[in-house]
Curated annotation (Swiss-Prot):
KW rRNA-binding (keyword) present: no
EC annotation from Swiss-Prot or TrEMBL: 3.1.26.5
Swiss-Prot/TrEMBL GO biological process terms: tRNA 5'-leader removal
Keywords noted in UniProt: Endonuclease, Hydrolase, Nuclease, RNA-binding, tRNA processing
GO cellular component labels: ribonuclease P complex
InterPro entries, per database record: Ribosomal_Su5_D2-typ_SF, Ribsml_uS5_D2-typ_fold_subgr, RNase_P
Protein name: Ribonuclease P protein component
EC supergroup of this enzyme: hydrolase
Pfam families on file: Ribonuclease_P
HAMAP family according to UniProt: RNase_P
Keyword ATP-binding in annotation: no
Subunit annotation: Consists of a catalytic RNA component (M1 or rnpB) and a protein subunit.
Length: 122
């Protein structure tokens, strides 16, 4: 995922955090703000120390999240900035669990239309 797809500055993070709508599941909180002037979506990822006590664990989760976003970028609404805040419940997730829970949260936030069939719960 290129850097132009990331919310990076503190000002942009605060803007999305303060003026955005939020939805959550057990593993992730999503803050979303509509930006009609955007050419493509931007995402910010936050994995706190309560989630992973080592940098290795936190970076692994961020890498998994970025991989899911990269795989699903054609499905994501291009006129939105959103933040993904990871909760401690996701501490020991593997790639499959991150994908399933993140797509569920993105569908709740209406950032993607619906969960792909291969990850839906029965």
């Amino acid at each position: 995922m290129r850097k132009s797809y990331r919310v990076k500055s503190e000002k942009d993070f605060q803007q999305v955090f303060e003026s955005g709508n939020s939805v959550a599941n057990r593993a992730f909180v999503i803050y979303k703000v509509e930006k009609p002037e955007n050419k493509h979506f931007r995402v910010g990822i936050s994995v706190g120390k309560k989630v992973g006590h080592t940098a290795v664990a936190r970076n692994r989760l961020k890498r998994y999240i970025r991989a899911v976003i990269d795989e699903e970028k054609l499905e994501i609404d291009p006129q939105v900035d959103f933040l993904i805040i990871t909760r401690p419940y996701a501490r020991n997730f593997d790639m499959v669990k991150v994908r399933k829970n993140l797509l569920h949260a993105l569908a709740l936030a209406h950032i993607i239309e619906e969960m792909p069939d291969e990850v839906e719960e029965n």
